[in-house]
């Protein structure tokens, strides 16, 4: 599962459509354009998976250019060490990073992250 954080509505879990990941086309459809990974404040241990390097937000790379609405809940998850991403806009997807892979979470893990962070 991955977690979708819309700019205006409640966050929700979505089942991965490609094994433990999602197809690029699905991710792009969910954020409304090309995806850009942004590191979050969450430690890799939140994923409860082996070899996870970090927890990521996937956002629309062109979101600011398109004038998408700000997403304050997504902003709260972002490391303040990355000032270029201080204002996140549009929908965001929470996923785990494992090397070059972007993977989802087990359902209970996604539910815990939603409950604790969103």
Regions found by a protein language model. Give the residues of each.
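Short beta-rich binding modules
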Residues: 1-118
């Amino acid at each position: 599962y991955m977690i979708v954080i819309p700019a205006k509505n409640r966050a929700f879990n979505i089942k991965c459509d490609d094994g433990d990941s999602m197809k690029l086309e699905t991710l792009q459809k969910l954020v409304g354009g090309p995806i850009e990974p942004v590191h979050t404040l969450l430690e890799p241990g939140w994923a409860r998976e082996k070899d996870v390097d970090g927890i990521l937000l996937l956002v629309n790379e062109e979101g600011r250019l398109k004038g998408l609405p700000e997403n304050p809940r997504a902003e709260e998850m972002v490391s303040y060490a990355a000032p270029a991403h201080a204002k996140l806009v549009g929908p965001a997807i929470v996923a785990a990073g494992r090397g070059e892979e972007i993977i989802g979470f087990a359902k209970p893990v996604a539910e815990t992250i939603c409950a604790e962070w969103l």
